[in-house]
């Protein structure tokens, strides 16, 4: 049985004051015991969040990390080893905003994924298609290629200690949401692609859905057989809304 997971991606939001307020809200949440909960704050506030959430069952991750696992001469980057030293346990890899805006390609993301795992971080690989690609009927082709790049270079076994998040680009921050069945269809295809290589890995890996998830639609989304939780954007900036989504995953 896969343990549900809800992860909050705070993106480039927050000040020390607003982060402190959000931490306080999270500390007062009654979270379901059967759900893994994580937050991904901006790197400047990672230490503040880790310190503020001590004693609370909420893991802290980073939104990005370097292609090299150890510290060195790579200006502006943060090594996975440094994230571990700071207290992080997870890192996002390949979020659509990194792919679309920062131009990160599969080869670079393979290196980031491997570097993170080499340091003991759990990578959360983000995959998803644009609206143009969906309308052209290329959703499974695009997602399959993004997933297949990791499998080809690192082997399917790399997903034994990783999480996959399907985030249709057209549903991120737009208010649009894939229907539960649309999301399930892609999640099922992802699991089948993994199963073609290793059925045990496929059964065990957690697949999260991201794309305008809210408390109002979380129950129906999380009720799908291959959706194991969510990667939450804007709704994770409101502690009460985030808590409601976590409880939906627990149900």
Curated annotation (Swiss-Prot):
GO cellular component: cytosol
Catalytic activity annotation: D-glyceraldehyde 3-phosphate = dihydroxyacetone phosphate
Associated pathway: Carbohydrate biosynthesis; gluconeogenesis; Carbohydrate degradation; glycolysis; D-glyceraldehyde 3-phosphate from glycerone phosphate: step 1/1
Protein's UniProt keywords contain Mitochondrion: no
Entry's Gene Ontology molecular function annotations: triose-phosphate isomerase activity
Enzyme nomenclature, EC number: 5.3.1.1
Disulfide-bond pairs as recorded: none
Places the protein is found: Cytoplasm
UniProtKB keywords: Cytoplasm, Gluconeogenesis, Glycolysis, Isomerase
Function: Involved in the gluconeogenesis. Catalyzes stereospecifically the conversion of dihydroxyacetone phosphate (DHAP) to D-glyceraldehyde-3-phosphate (G3P).
Assembly description: Homodimer.
Family designation: Belongs to the triosephosphate isomerase family.
Name the record gives this protein: Triosephosphate isomerase
Species for this entry: Pseudomonas fluorescens (strain Pf0-1)
């Amino acid at each position: 049985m896969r343990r549900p997971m809800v992860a909050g991606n705070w993106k480039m939001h927050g000040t020390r004051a607003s982060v402190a307020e959000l931490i306080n809200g999270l500390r007062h949440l009654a979270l379901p015991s059967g759900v893994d909960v994580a937050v991904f704050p901006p790197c400047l506030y990672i230490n503040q969040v880790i310190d503020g959430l001590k004693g609370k069952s909420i893991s802290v991750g980073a939104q990005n990390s370097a292609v090299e696992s150890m510290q060195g001469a790579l200006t502006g980057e943060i090594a996975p080893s440094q994230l571990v030293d700071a207290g992080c346990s997870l890192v996002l890899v390949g979020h659509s905003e990194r792919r679309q805006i920062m131009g990160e390609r599969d080869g670079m993301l393979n290196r980031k994924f491997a570097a993170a795992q080499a340091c003991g971080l759990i990578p959360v690989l983000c995959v998803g298609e644009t609206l143009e690609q969906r309308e052209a009927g290329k959703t499974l082709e695009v997602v399959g290629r993004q997933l297949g790049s990791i499998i080809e270079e690192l082997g399917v076994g790399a997903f034994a200690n990783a999480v996959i998040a399907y985030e249709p680009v057209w549903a991120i921050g737009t208010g649009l949401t894939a229907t539960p069945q649309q999301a399930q269809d892609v999640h099922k295809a992802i699991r089948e692609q993994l199963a073609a290589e290793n059925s045990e890995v496929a059964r065990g890996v957690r697949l999260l859905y991201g794309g305008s998830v809210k408390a109002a639609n979380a129950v129906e989304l999380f009720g799908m057989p291959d959706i194991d939780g969510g990667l939450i954007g804007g709704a994770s900036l409101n502690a009460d809304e985030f808590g409601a989504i976590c409880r939906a995953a627990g149900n």
